[in-house]
Amino acid sequence: SLSLDLLQKTHDKGLAKYIGVSNYNIAMLNEAINKLTVKPITNQIEFHPLIDQSKILNFAKSKNIDLFAYCSIARGKILEISTLNNIAIRHKISIPQVAQHWAYQKGVIVNSMSTKPDNINDNFNILNFELSIEEMSQISNLNSENHRIVTREKMDDKDPPMGNCVPDWD
C-alpha cells in the first residue's frame, strides 16, 4: 500500500528510526511485517473495557508490537458502568483510573488526556494499585456489546469522508 511505501521511504532516508501505525487490524499488521524492512513497533487502536480487542492484542504480543490505546475511557461511556464503579470504590480511585490500569495490566500503553488538573493527576496515578485476577476478568467481560467509539459510519460523516481510515477490525 502507499502508506507502507511512504513509511519505508521515511525510514530509509533516516527520517524515522522506528515505525508506528494506527488502526491496523491483524491482516494489515501482517502486510506491514511482510512488506517493511523494519516492522512496526506500535499500533495505536481504540482500546477500552467496552470493546473486545483480545485478538489484536494477542497477535501484537506474539510479534512484539506494542498496542497504544486511544479512547481508553470510551469518551466517558465507562462512567456509567456499575462494575467499574464498584471496583473504583473498593480501591478508592476513579473509574477512569480503573479502566486505564486494566489496559496497563493487559500490557497496553495508555494515551490519556485532560485539561482538568484533577484528571491529569489521576492519569499519573494509575500505577499505585493492582487489580486482582477476578477484577481483571470482570472488566474484560464488559465487552459483550463491543461498543466502538470510532466506526466507519462515524468517520463517513466527516467532510471529507474518512471511512477509509477505519478498517474492518478483527
What spans do the regions from the language model cover?
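Beta/alpha (TIM)-barrel catalytic core signal, keyed to glycine-rich beta->alpha loops juxtaposed to Asp/Glu
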Residues: 1-170
